[in-house]
Design a protein with these regions (language model features):
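Active-site and donor-binding regions of nucleotide-sugar-utilizing enzymes
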Residues: 19-22, 26-40, 44-215
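Inter-lobe coupling/hinge segments of SF2-like helicase ATPases
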Residues: 208-210, 217-219, 223-226
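Alpha-helical structural motif
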Residues: 2-5, 9, 31, 182, ...
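Membrane-interacting alpha-helical segments
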Residues: 3-21
Length: 232
């Protein structure tokens, strides 16, 4: 498809530019030596066909923590790799001994191919709405199922995507194994875009399952301030 090809070319050209911009920005130092992971450069080793959870930053990570904990309790022998796009999100995984963290690759064909071919995940579980066409296409070529958890889609966004329904499904919708939505409205909005009903279910927001205590509230406020600093 022509739009898919255009997207690949554009992201291949822009990825090095975005990488350099992040590297030399004020927040670049927060990534440390691991900033090269944004280009898919993770260590060469056996990752044991892990289940891969992606949470873009603080909010998604906080919502995913109970799910990841329950997954580990149910399958303690299964290796878990988690990715975030920001250092503040990464910090929330720092004390979880049963997960391995990496920064998610930029959505360029080369970066996602390098990353996924080294990782060899058995499945990818994405929190909320972090959907990248090159990554989804690469995982489809490797027969890796992708699940969207805590999925949300506003009526406004659904109406906008509906104008390119065929393109949306070619680049994104067809690549998803299952979408577990927050609300009935979210489910209906995804269905309007052509997602088959058998791929859709409702769980409610995982963020309501967070075990909130004063320490976590304080931590959340701290990371919220850090996140604002990153954007400046």
């Amino acid at each position: 498809m022509i739009l898919s090809l255009i997207y690949k070319v554009v992201t291949a050209v822009l990825a090095p530019v975005i990488y350099q911009k992040i590297r030399f920005s004020a927040k670049g130092n927060a990534y440390g030596e691991r900033i090269n992971e944004l280009l898919g450069n993770i260590p060469e080793k056996d990752y044991h066909s892990p289940v891969w959870f992606h949470t873009v930053s603080v909010g998604e990570t906080m919502g995913a923590l109970p799910l990841i904990k329950k997954f580990h309790e149910r399958w303690p022998d299964k290796h878990i790799v988690v990715t975030t796009s920001t250092p503040t999100g990464a910090a929330l995984y720092k004390n979880l001994s049963y997960v391995e963290h990496h920064y998610a690759p930029l959505d360029s064909p080369i970066a996602v191919k390098k990353f996924t071919e080294k990782l060899k995940p058995s499945a990818l579980i994405i929190m909320e709405t972090e959907l990248w066409p090159n990554l989804l296409q690469e995982l489809e070529s490797q027969d890796v199922p992708v699940y969207l958890i805590n999925a949300r889609l506003s009526e406004r966004s659904a109406s906008r995507y509906a104008m390119l329904k065929s393109t949306f499904n070619t680049l994104i919708g067809d690549k998803l194994k299952m979408l577990i939505c927050q609300t009935v409205d979210d489910r209906n909005n995804f269905e309007k875009l052509g997602i088959p009903p058998n791929k859709l279910s409702i769980s409610g927001s995982l963020k309501f399952d967070i075990d909130v205590n004063p320490e976590k509230i304080a931590l959340g406020k701290k990371f919220k301030k850090l996140r604002k600093t990153e954007k400046n």
